[in-house]
Amino acid sequence: QALFAVSCLVLLAALKPVMRTNWGRLFVFAVTLYTPASWAENTLRVYRDNIYPSLVLLALAGLLGAFTRFREKPLRALPYYVAAGLSLAAAWLCHEDNALLLPFVLCAAAVYLAYLFLDKSIAHKKSRLALLLVPLALWGGGIAAWCGMNYKYYGRFIISDFTSSEFNDAMGALSRAYPDDQKRYELVPLSTRLALYEVSPTFAKL
């Protein structure tokens, strides 16, 4: 909950150039802080489903903070770009369905580039364009560093077993073994495992 509150505070600061009144920003802060994602039952435990909404919100706040400052000095937006890049990398690492982040990031970048090149009054366009590479570099660099750590200790340049093709193939084969025994929230139920133990000595060792 503390991380979600911090993300809300970053959003509050990010909107300052476009929301001048304190009451307006306070309203956005309160509505965001008490959104169902912050107190839903499945997000009250300290694990990835708890921090994922916070990281996505922090990424959104970082991009908004950078984009709403496109008329100010380029370096004023740098902290927000850094926050966006780091939070995107962290969000990408803690969920398997991270591809859902791509449309959000691509749309945000497209809108920013459209304003940057179509608005003739914006100065330092090259500097602003270069700053857009900061979150992308932190995003990709964070993922690469994590994969590199896995390679160093486990010999696999992957994010996790869940993202490896071998794991997905194995779990897919196990889940398809006895389709009539499938249960909700149980990928390989006990009845399926017991049946597989009889025909697979290797699986039985697990």
Where in this protein do the model-derived segments appear?
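Aromatic- and kink-enriched transmembrane "portal" helix at the membrane-lumen/periplasm boundary
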Residues: 1-4, 30-55, 89, 93
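Transmembrane-helix signature of polytopic, membrane-embedded enzymes
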Residues: 6-37, 53-54, 72-79
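Specific aromatic-rich, kink-prone transmembrane helix
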Residues: 10-13, 51-71, 86-88, 105-106, ...
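Membrane-interfacial segments
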Residues: 15-23, 67-71, 114-119, 153, ...
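Short hydrophobic alpha-helices at membrane interfaces in multi-pass membrane enzymes
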Residues: 23-25, 66-89, 125-133
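Membrane-interface alpha helices of multi-pass inner-membrane proteins
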Residues: 80-95, 139-146
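Perimembrane helix-loop-helix junctions
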Residues: 101-136
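Juxtamembrane membrane-water interface segments immediately following transmembrane helices
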Residues: 139-206
